[in-house]
Amino acid sequence: MARPLVPSSQKALLLELKGLQEEPVEGFRVTLVDEGDLYNWEVAIFGPPNTYYEGGYFKARLKFPIDYPYSPPAFRFLTKMWHPNIYETGDVCISILHPPVDDPQSGELPSERWNPTQNVRTILLSVISLLNEPNTFSPANVDASVMYRKWKESKGKDREYTDIIRKQVLGTKVDAERDGVKVPTTLAEYCVKTKAPAPDEGSDLFYDDYYEDGEVEEEADSCFGDDEDDSGTEES
């Protein structure tokens, strides 16, 4: 009897999963929502040091379509986020997650949208960049966008936007403690890279211990949070 065909998306996701095990992205931890289901990932995002998100533990979900990587996954925050480009539902409004169609009304170039050469790693890097550099030209949360622009234009004197973010960061500590997660608070901790050990047979496909002994990246600027002009960087 012939074996059922395995969708190519499963093979692609398995390869990406292994790649993220061997070369983790700084500031992220990924697990499966349900063991054995490659189409639903849980993502933990750690707030980059030297930004208003420092010390934060933000949880999200990545849901992949059956025709991945030809169609983009959906990225939704489970943690409540106050951000110009995040809807109240937690859905993220970012070009890389939009289908590769020519839509002149969107204001986006086709090259800015999803294409099959993109992957989970590029999505994660785009999301962390978006947190620090919101796009106020096409906001998903208008009120957050207005607050952010006031903060930006006042050069940090108007703190309504950042005060909300800091309150949300403090609120995530409960989730981190409940999940037994140690959140990085220094650049050295944030930039540490560890290689996940090969999973035992029958174990979860992902590594469980993010923080192990590892080498800190020699180039600190390879990590998020060093740019003096970053909009999310705390000002004195």
Curated annotation (Swiss-Prot):
<dbReference type="GO" id="GO:0006511">
    <property type="term" value="P:ubiquitin-dependent protein catabolic process"/>
</dbReference>
<dbReference type="GO" id="GO:0005829">
    <property type="term" value="C:cytosol"/>
</dbReference>
<feature type="active site" description="Glycyl thioester intermediate">
    <location>
        <position position="93"/>
    </location>
</feature>
<feature type="modified residue" description="Phosphoserine; by CK2">
    <location>
        <position position="231"/>
    </location>
</feature>
<keyword id="KW-0832">Ubl conjugation</keyword>
<feature type="region of interest" description="Disordered">
    <location>
        <begin position="216"/>
        <end position="236"/>
    </location>
</feature>
<keyword id="KW-0067">ATP-binding</keyword>
<dbReference type="GO" id="GO:0000082">
    <property type="term" value="P:G1/S transition of mitotic cell cycle"/>
</dbReference>
<dbReference type="InterPro" id="IPR000608">
    <property type="entry name" value="UBQ-conjugat_E2_core"/>
</dbReference>
<dbReference type="GO" id="GO:0016607">
    <property type="term" value="C:nuclear speck"/>
</dbReference>
<comment type="subunit">
    <text>Interacts with multiple Cul1-RING E3 ubiquitin-protein ligase complexes, also known as SCF (SKP1-CUL1-F-box protein) complexes. Identified in a SCF E3 ubiquitin ligase complex together with HINT1 and RBX1. When cullin is neddylated, the interaction between the E2 and the SCF complex is strengthened. Interacts with multiple Cul2-RING (CRL2) E3 ubiquitin-protein ligase complexes, also known as ECS (Elongin BC-CUL2/5-SOCS-box protein) complexes. When phosphorylated, interacts with beta-TrCP (BTRC).</text>
</comment>
<dbReference type="InterPro" id="IPR023313">
    <property type="entry name" value="UBQ-conjugating_AS"/>
</dbReference>
<feature type="modified residue" description="Phosphoserine; by CK2">
    <location>
        <position position="222"/>
    </location>
</feature>
<comment type="similarity">
    <text>Belongs to the ubiquitin-conjugating enzyme family.</text>
</comment>
<comment type="function">
    <text>E2 ubiquitin-conjugating enzyme that accepts ubiquitin from an E1 ubiquitin-activating protein, and catalyzes its covalent attachment to other proteins by an E3 ubiquitin-protein ligase complex. In vitro catalyzes 'Lys-48'-linked polyubiquitination. Cooperates with the E2 UBCH5C and the SCF(FBXW11) E3 ligase complex for the polyubiquitination of NFKBIA leading to its subsequent proteasomal degradation. Performs ubiquitin chain elongation building ubiquitin chains from the UBE2D3-primed NFKBIA-linked ubiquitin.</text>
</comment>
<dbReference type="InterPro" id="IPR050113">
    <property type="entry name" value="Ub_conjugating_enzyme"/>
</dbReference>
<feature type="modified residue" description="Phosphoserine; by CK2">
    <location>
        <position position="203"/>
    </location>
</feature>
<dbReference type="GO" id="GO:0070936">
    <property type="term" value="P:protein K48-linked ubiquitination"/>
</dbReference>
<keyword id="KW-0963">Cytoplasm</keyword>
<keyword id="KW-0539">Nucleus</keyword>
<dbReference type="GO" id="GO:0000209">
    <property type="term" value="P:protein polyubiquitination"/>
</dbReference>
<feature type="domain" description="UBC core">
    <location>
        <begin position="8"/>
        <end position="174"/>
    </location>
</feature>
<dbReference type="GO" id="GO:0036211">
    <property type="term" value="P:protein modification process"/>
</dbReference>
<dbReference type="GO" id="GO:0006270">
    <property type="term" value="P:DNA replication initiation"/>
</dbReference>
<dbReference type="GO" id="GO:0005524">
    <property type="term" value="F:ATP binding"/>
</dbReference>
<feature type="region of interest" description="Important for ubiquitin transfer">
    <location>
        <begin position="98"/>
        <end position="113"/>
    </location>
</feature>
<keyword id="KW-0547">Nucleotide-binding</keyword>
<feature type="modified residue" description="Phosphothreonine; by CK2">
    <location>
        <position position="233"/>
    </location>
</feature>
<dbReference type="GO" id="GO:0016567">
    <property type="term" value="P:protein ubiquitination"/>
</dbReference>
<keyword id="KW-0808">Transferase</keyword>
<feature type="region of interest" description="SCF-binding">
    <location>
        <begin position="190"/>
        <end position="236"/>
    </location>
</feature>
<dbReference type="GO" id="GO:0043161">
    <property type="term" value="P:proteasome-mediated ubiquitin-dependent protein catabolic process"/>
</dbReference>
<feature type="modified residue" description="Phosphoserine; by CK2">
    <location>
        <position position="236"/>
    </location>
</feature>
<dbReference type="GO" id="GO:0005634">
    <property type="term" value="C:nucleus"/>
</dbReference>
<dbReference type="GO" id="GO:0005654">
    <property type="term" value="C:nucleoplasm"/>
</dbReference>
<protein>
    <recommendedName>
        <fullName>Ubiquitin-conjugating enzyme E2 R1</fullName>
        <ecNumber>2.3.2.23</ecNumber>
        <ecNumber>2.3.2.24</ecNumber>
    </recommendedName>
</protein>
<keyword id="KW-0597">Phosphoprotein</keyword>
<keyword id="KW-0131">Cell cycle</keyword>
<keyword id="KW-0833">Ubl conjugation pathway</keyword>
<comment type="pathway">
    <text>Protein modification; protein ubiquitination.</text>
</comment>
<dbReference type="Pfam" id="PF00179">
    <property type="entry name" value="UQ_con"/>
</dbReference>
<dbReference type="InterPro" id="IPR016135">
    <property type="entry name" value="UBQ-conjugating_enzyme/RWD"/>
</dbReference>
